[in-house]
């Protein structure tokens, strides 16, 4: 059980896929299931020498703190929630990483996890989504931090529809009633 060469992430994902397929067979066919992404703060404020420890922005307190962002992928049918996979993400910016990564063999899973921890949230999210390709869920659900046009387009390429709150910003425009408009203008017309 303590072997670092074993791919525990893949094992957990395979077990959860099997369990989800079992639950899905027992539920009604008209019930929709979703994959849910959540990005939470994993605070490590007292830590000093944790590998890949970074300054991350906490959206609830609107401050930077030491820790990681924990990207979690889960499955739900409306009554049941099952976690499928998660990744601890450091920062993509070198100046925000407080402790560097140890030197490890590039052929190992440990190296791949360290590289993945420094990738963008969107890239890691798509990697997790591709890993869940066998899980029956038509929709991907996430909050407004992910609901950007680039993210929606990339999720659609994975043959999943998106449910999410649109981020209110002046910079992004959507086509509504034949015109390109920002979200505030669309809300005023509804």
Positions of PLM-derived features:
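Electropositive, glycine- and tryptophan-enriched low-complexity nucleic-acid-binding patches
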Residues: 1-7, 60-135, 185-186
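Active-site-proximal, Lys/Arg-enriched surface segment
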Residues: 3-92
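Glutamate identity and glutamate-enriched acidic tracts
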Residues: 9, 28, 49-51, 95, ...
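An internal, acidic/charged active-site-proximal segment
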Residues: 98-190
């Amino acid at each position: 059980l303590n072997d670092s060469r074993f791919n525990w992430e893949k094992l957990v994902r395979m077990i959860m896929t099997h369990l989800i397929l079992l639950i899905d067979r027992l539920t009604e066919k008209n019930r929709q299931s979703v994959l849910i992404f959540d990005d939470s703060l994993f605070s490590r404020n007292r830590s000093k020498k944790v590998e890949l420890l970074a300054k991350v922005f906490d959206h609830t307190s609107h401050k930077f703190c030491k820790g990681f962002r924990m990207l979690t992928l889960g499955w739900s049918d409306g009554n049941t929630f099952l976690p499928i996979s998660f990744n601890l993400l450091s920062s993509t910016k070198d100046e925000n990483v407080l402790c560097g990564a140890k030197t490890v063999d590039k052929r190992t899973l440990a190296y791949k996890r360290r590289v993945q921890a420094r990738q963008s949230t969107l890239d890691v999210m798509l990697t997790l989504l591709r890993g869940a390709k066998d899980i029956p869920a038509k929709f991907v659900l996430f909050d407004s931090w992910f609901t950007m046009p680039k993210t929606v387009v990339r999720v659609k390429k994975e043959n999943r529809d998106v449910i999410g709150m649109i981020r209110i910003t002046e910079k992004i425009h959507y086509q509504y009633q034949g015109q390109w408009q920002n979200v505030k203008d669309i809300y005023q017309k509804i």
